[in-house]
Amino acid sequence: MVFLKFLWMGFLCHLCQGYFDGPLYPEMSNGTLHHYFVPDGDYEENDDPEKCQLLFRVSDHRRCSQGEGSSASTLLSLTLREEFTVLGRQVEDAGRVLEGISKSISYDLDGEESYGKYLRRESHQIGDAYSNSDKSLTELESKFKQGQEQDSRQESRLNEDFLGMLVHTRSLLKETLDISVGLRDKYELLALTIRSHGTRLGRLKNDYLKV
């Protein structure tokens, strides 16, 4: 039933360009000549505007035949009251736009008096940030160079230590070889001494037995 009612209302609106003669509720208006016609008289957020939106004038009664024609003739047929109403709404819209622009400008200025001072402050902040970043980069470069120098010094120290260990090991090996050669000579001398003593003991024994 409700769907048929909306369908019939849409058909009537198409025939007579959607003029509505009913009472105007404050919650129906959206600031222009387009108003929301709500069947139950209570506009809510869940109401579909496309199903209950009609174009009507705030004036006396009109016939459907008077609404037919071009938009130019419709605009020319406005009464003085309607023109004042339209102008008043346009002034209100312009005031709201200007108020929004002033708020956005005051928000952009961030407490400054003019854009010049705001831009100078921003340029100073950008310059300070650039100088700080340049200083940080310089410090990083110096630390990197110091690290490279320390690494090179440590590498050279390690090389020197390794070479020193090689030289020391070589000297120890040479000393060990010398000691081993000396021990071998002493061993041969000791063997000769023992053999000579054995020969003498054998000869003395033979001489003793003969006597």
Swiss-Prot record:
State the oligomer form and interacting partners.
Answer: Homodimer; disulfide-linked. Seems to also exist as monomers.
Taken from the UniProt entry, a GO cellular component term is: endoplasmic reticulum
Domain of life from the UniProt record: Eukaryota
Quote the protein name from its UniProt record: Fin bud initiation factor homolog
Glycan-carrying positions = 30
Q: Which organism is it from?
A: Bos taurus
Q: List the top taxonomic levels of the source.
A: Eukaryota, Metazoa, Chordata, Craniata, Vertebrata
Tell me where the signal peptide lies.
1-18
Per the similarity annotation, which family is this?
A: Belongs to the FIBIN family.
**Gene that produces this protein:** FIBIN
Which keywords does the record carry?
A: Disulfide bond, Endoplasmic reticulum, Glycoprotein, Golgi apparatus, Secreted, Signal
Q: Where in the cell is it found?
A: Secreted; Golgi apparatus; Endoplasmic reticulum
Q: Which GO terms describe its molecular function?
A: protein homodimerization activity
